Amino acid sequence: MPQLKVLINGGGIAGNAIAFWLTKLGHDVTVLERFPALRTTGLQLDLRGHGIEVLKRMGLDDAMKAKVIKEDGAQFVDTNGKVVAYFPAVDTSKGGVQAFTSEYEIMRGDICRVFYAATKDRATYKFGTSVESFEDLGDSIKVQLTDHTVDHYDLLIGADGVTSSIRKMMLGPGVPDKFIQFQNLYASYFTIPAPIKPDEKYMANIFIAPGSKLLMTRRDNPERLQVYMGGKAPGARLENARRGDTAEEKLGIEEFMQGCGWRTSEMIDELRKADDFYLERLGMVKLDSWHRGRVALVGEAAWCSSVLTGMGTTSCLVGAYCLAGEIAKHCGRGDQGEAKDDPMMVQKNLANALAGYEEKFMPFMHQVQDGLSAKTGTRTYMPSSQWGVTILNWVIKIIALLRLNMAGDWVIREAVRNWKLPDYPELLKE
């Protein structure tokens, strides 16, 4: 089959993952990133289940292992900092699902760097620009960028995250966006300078407070802590804060978390000084189809499952693998030197590939997103009353004493049932 000319809008995890596979197949790939350089900000992510297998098939397992954070586990603490329950990391070499701490705890920036390093010599990267508009012409897709350049492509892939502009343009004017925000559910992230103490372990510390509030700290290096603050936060300040208005978002989180206990006051002081603060309005993206014509979506642009499922990064990798595999299956390699003399045949093959992508991967995402909606997405296991917090802490303590895997078995949706990772021999050929 002839070489495909592919444009990927978004240079994050999903965009780099699909670029890796398509360039390995010999296709002509351009990746757009609206930031002026590779975006390596973001906090700790993890890989689970099928995502780890995809990483191994990429041949990047060793490179990623070199970046793994050696987190010992997770512990719940009370308002005085006393440990309520401890859940160690789980060795899954003998099977089973991982715990709250996975074997692959990695900073987002390190994941992006590993994928970019493996792809940059095969793909064309354009930083500081993105797609402004596109028109599907049938035999190609005409794309105009924000730098005013215009070109034609065989396929446009939107890998531009939960607020995807490609998704909105694909759905068309007047069609409501398919991002569903969970009612009043917010999470904020930032880092603080905090040299490690002599007896301190690399640990996730979780504090649940009345009012459905949560404070968590994690350590990824000896000099700093990651801080996570949020919960179910009704209130006009956060609801009305403009996305990206950091000052107003900080004030909203400060108002919400004030007086919770444990290290909240200390973290609010650090929040005011943080220059890497980010507020996420938790929600999900759910579509009936991830493509239209010569436009396809991948990653959070297509199926954001929210941080509540613990499957965001894994879903990005597995979805990109399935999309590339179906393109390989129906469109073949791009380095065979064949002329593109029949655009309608290319269109037909692409249509089959994109349909196959949905057929293969949608059952996976249906399980990951099962039961989530604007209302049910707010089931955060965080009680509103002090009595509820006390009961929850006792339940968590009993679960830990019984050595049950609370996160792996009941919270994180790693165990996707009756779904097998497809084999695509074309992707594994050198």
From Swiss-Prot:
Hydrolase is among the record's keywords: no
Free-text comment on the cofactor: Binds 1 FAD per subunit.
EC numbers, comma separated: 1.14.13.-
Biotechnology: Xenovulene A is a natural product exhibiting little structural resemblance with classical benzodiazepines yet is able to displace high-affinity ligand binding to the benzodiazepine site of the gamma-aminobutyrate A (GABAA) receptor and could be potentially used as an anti-depressant with reduced addictive properties.
Pfam families per the UniProt record, alphabetical: FAD_binding_3
Phenotype of gene-disrupted mutants: Severely reduces, but does not abolish xenovulene A biosynthesis.
Record GO biological process: terpenoid biosynthetic process
Keywords from the UniProt entry: FAD, Flavoprotein, NADP, Nucleotide-binding, Oxidoreductase
Residue positions binding FAD: G11, G12, I13, A14, E33, R34, R108, Y278
Gene Ontology terms for molecular function: FAD binding; oxidoreductase activity
Factors inducing expression: Expression is significantly up-regulated under xenovulene A producing condition.
Residue runs in coiled coils: none
PANTHER family noted in UniProt: MONOOXYGENASE, PUTATIVE (AFU_ORTHOLOGUE AFUA_8G07040)-RELATED (PTHR46865:SF7), OXIDOREDUCTASE-RELATED (PTHR46865)
Protein family (similarity comment): Belongs to the aromatic-ring hydroxylase family.
The protein's name: FAD-dependent monooxygenase asL4
Source organism per UniProt: Sarocladium schorii
Gene that produces this protein: asL4
